[in-house]
Amino acid sequence: MNKLRQKYLQKWLRAQQEPIKKLMRANIVLATLSSFILVAQTYFLATLLDKLIMQNVPRDELIPYFLGLIIGFGMRAIILWAREKIGFQSGQLLRNHIRQKILDKIHLVGPATINQKPAGSWASIMLEQVENLHNFYARFLPQQSLSAIVPVVIFIAVFPLNWAAGLILMITAPLVPLFMIIVGIAAADNSQKNMDTLSRLSAQFLDRLRGLETLRLFNRTSEQTEHIENATEDFRETTMDVLKLAFLSSAVLEFFTSISIALMAVYFGFSYLGQIEFGTYNAPLTLFTGFFCLILAPEFYQPLRDLGTYYHDRAAGIGAADAIVDFLESDYLTVHQNEKTISLESAVEISAENLVVLSTQGSALTKPLNFQIPANHNVALVGQSGAGKTSLMNVILGFLPYEGSLKINGQELRESNLADWRKHIAWVGQNPLLLQGTIKENLLLGDVQANDEEINQALMRSQAKEFTDKLGLHHEIKDGGLGISVGQAQRLAIARALLRKGDLLLLDEPTASLDAQSENLVLQALNEASQHQTTLMITHRIEDLKQCDQIFVMQRGEIVQQGKFTELQHEGFFAELLAQRQQDIQ
């Protein structure tokens, strides 16, 4: 990562702190107050020791100084607790703020873009990388301000008593941040590499975990285990590189801090021996002055040392922000959102004229498409993998941008309220998502107002009633659909879609996981449903499309044939697909 990129990422991170500006100011004010209390405590302690050792003052007269010292400890403890709490709240608010920005962007670009990355990579961005921003806001930014304020407060307190001690502080102070920067130059690069390695490890591990059954069937578990081990070793090495820099930085900071404090101790030692006679403004050097300056000396460097420690939080934050900013600022093409709703007083009718579906990067996914889907028609979309069928369905859902014209009931889709449009769509995909919860809770995602009779009707039509009667509607489905078979999950998804009563039914291989008998029964239910709504179905089982009102045949991103089954079965690319399908069945 070059320096310009690092500067830009740090500028971006600072620009995100608008929601927590008040908390940040409160943190700095409390820390400044704590530094004044520290100076007062040091005054009480130095005065107490001077009076006790040099002036032999009765102990009764020292009680106010003891009380001042104790009250100071109590106040600083309360301030420290308040600062820790404010810092945590700041980091938490910023994490939530940035996560919301990521979620908003994900919602904007849609699933067609999200599927371009493994789920593990998204999980890493949303969880680990956003978490790594916490200390940047909770610790580094407040400490950066304090490292300028607290030393100035202490310098102002020390310099009027002894200008030589103040001069030592002033000369040695820049050494700490200087060497901190020198040592930490590579920290951001190492942190960014560490985040990239973690993202790859997360993606690999989650994908292999999900495909464990397939790996076992093909006897590839040992090979993939080795890949995971290699990725884990890479992550260990990058983590150790970050830790090496952290320990080296700490050692360098401690060294220069110790040297600086030692210089002041040597100065006062020789001054008390009478070897040095400057720095006191021609006044005698008292024990109070020596104690006061030496007690404050470590506190003078402490904010700078803390900044050095938290400097690695800055590096970690910049490294984590790289992938986040890259996603948030990527120039994805999206369908423009409008407030105009589509009139659905009549059934859905779709028409396309020179429609070219675009990816979010702007490349064409299809050639110009021209078609008409009349209201209440059951239309099948067939073709080989990669022909553009799913892209066409995604553009109808409003997940992909397009050129040309795509009208729903005569209204251009790009000029419509997409959120409202999707409320009128029922959709079943190849791998339907069932959430962790009961069967009934998953069905009610289709229509939260549905009663038991409507649920039973949908289950019967989707051929799911058979197993739901045995399991019960309150049967618990685990994460990822565990607890039911793939075919059962498919039928529940179809029941959910039928329950939704959408004006448009979109089906992507709805019978892919069903046996022949269930498939025929479900197709009958879908054919019945299509009498009351417009239906567009993607399928490879083209031998079962005799009931469809119309078939669109796609090849290499264009519709090469349109018509009914009887019109297409003996000619063109559809006849080839049908012959190939029948050969596969045999």
From Swiss-Prot:
Reaction(s) the record says it catalyses: L-cysteine(in) + ATP + H2O = L-cysteine(out) + ADP + phosphate + H(+); glutathione(in) + ATP + H2O = glutathione(out) + ADP + phosphate + H(+)
Domain called ABC transmembrane type-1: residue spans: 28-316
InterPro entries (alphabetical): AAA+_ATPase, ABC1_TM_dom, ABC1_TM_sf, ABC_transporter-like_ATP-bd, ABC_transporter-like_CS, ABC_transptr_CydD, P-loop_NTPase, Type_1_exporter
One Pfam family this sequence matches: ABC_tran
Matching Gene3D superfamilies: ABC transporter type 1, transmembrane domain, P-loop containing nucleotide triphosphate hydrolases
Keywords for the protein's UniProt record, in alphabetical order: Amino-acid transport, ATP-binding, Cell inner membrane, Cell membrane, Membrane, Nucleotide-binding, Translocase, Transmembrane, Transmembrane helix, Transport
Membrane topology recorded in Swiss-Prot or TrEMBL: Multi-pass membrane protein
PROSITE patterns reported in the protein's UniProt record: ABC_TM1F (PS50929), ABC_TRANSPORTER_1 (PS00211), ABC_TRANSPORTER_2 (PS50893)
Residue positions binding ATP: G383, Q384, S385, G386, A387, G388, K389, T390
Family annotation (NCBIfam families): CydD (TIGR02857), PRK11174.1 (NF008379)
Similarity annotation: Belongs to the ABC transporter superfamily. Cysteine exporter (TC 3.A.1.129.1) family.
Subunit structure as annotated in this protein's UniProt entry: Forms a heterodimer with CydC.
Protein name per its UniProtKB record: Glutathione/L-cysteine transport system ATP-binding/permease protein CydD
Species of provenance: Haemophilus influenzae (strain ATCC 51907 / DSM 11121 / KW20 / Rd)
